[in-house]
Amino acid sequence: AWMRAPYEPQEGQPADYRGYGTMTDEAVRDANRKARERKMQLLAHCNGDGACGQYLDCWEQAAEEERTEREKRAGGRTPGNDRPVMIHAQLLGLDQLARLKALGMIPSFFLAHVYHWGEDHVRNFGWERASRISPAGSALALGIPFTLHQDSPVIRPDMLETLWCAVNRLTRDGRILGKEERIPVWDALRAVTANGAWQYFEEEEKGTISPGKRADFALLSADPLKTPPENLRDIRVLATVKDGERIWGDGI
């Protein structure tokens, strides 16, 4: 992860080691420019707050270019209409959230990191920074819509484990990593349903079970809203339905 401040001391690395970027600023700006010209949504993989800052800088420049262009013509698209996505946003700084919101950018958090590698983050970045990884609670407080993902095949595609991670934020050692970043079950469910559809411009046909929308849903062994938070990952998927047809399971 490319960081703004150095890692905790790392064997074989200088004391000021911060990781490094994989793209130049110009390459990021060029990708942004091409995406906007072709009216394509842009999603960028950003782990450290250094990479997050580079992506935000790119979009802030795009926003300024759009404002200048709108002075020359009426109407037009804005960066917010493009719904750019920041994938992982693992070590996104809390001070960067306001910038992200102003741009209409969507963070998609790989929140299972808290359980699978939370203790590694503590060793690499110290407790304070590690406790802020995947800051879903702070994003929620600011009214920023976000989604959750598993990054399969890095880990298995288990959405219920991800819900459990978002609500409890327990590491493998059983420690709560970032109590203030935990979110309610309802908001975790929205992050993987309605917000997911909205992220990909599909909110008119997916994301909620509503009249006129596609009948895409999963049948679970228990109601997540009535299940003790510590037991969320024990809920089983009994069946999945797509366009009204059962495609997996025999629960219905």
Residue ranges and their predicted role:
Residues 1-41, 69-72, 97:
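Active-site-adjacent helix-turn-beta-strand microarchitecture at beta-sheet edges
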Residues 33-43, 50-84, 89, 94-226, ...:
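His/Asp/Glu-enriched, well-ordered alpha-helical/loop segment
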Residues 249-252:
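Glycine- and charge-enriched low-complexity intrinsically disordered segments
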